[in-house]
Structure formats: structure tokens, C-alpha cells
Curated annotation (Swiss-Prot):
Pfam families: Ribosomal_L36
Record-annotated disulphide pairs: none
Family, as annotated: Belongs to the bacterial ribosomal protein bL36 family.
Protein name as it appears in the record: Large ribosomal subunit protein bL36
Highest taxon in the source lineage: Bacteria
InterPro entries, per database record: Ribosomal_bL36, Ribosomal_bL36_sp, Ribosomal_L36_bact
Keywords (A to Z) from UniProt: Ribonucleoprotein, Ribosomal protein
Single Gene Ontology MF annotation: structural constituent of ribosome
Gene: rpmJ
Regions that span the bilayer: none
GO biological process, one term: translation
Amino acid sequence: MKVLSSLKSAKARHRDCKVVRRRGKIFVICKSNPRFKARQR
């Protein structure tokens, strides 16, 4: 999982990517291609 300062580019990497908020952190999850997972500090 990558830690990114901006998730806008991470969301655009794949059409299944979703931005979710968990435990006060913002995550990008991607079910079909989990390699694109990312989070913001």
C-alpha cells in the first residue's frame, strides 16, 4: 500500500478504485486490482 499526499491521481488509476474514509484516514481501495491500494497520512 502506498502512502500518498494526493489521492486524486490514485483514484484515476483504475475504474474500480474507490475513495473511502476509515479511522480518520482516507484510503483508496480497489477490489479488482489490489495493487492500487493507497492511503493518505
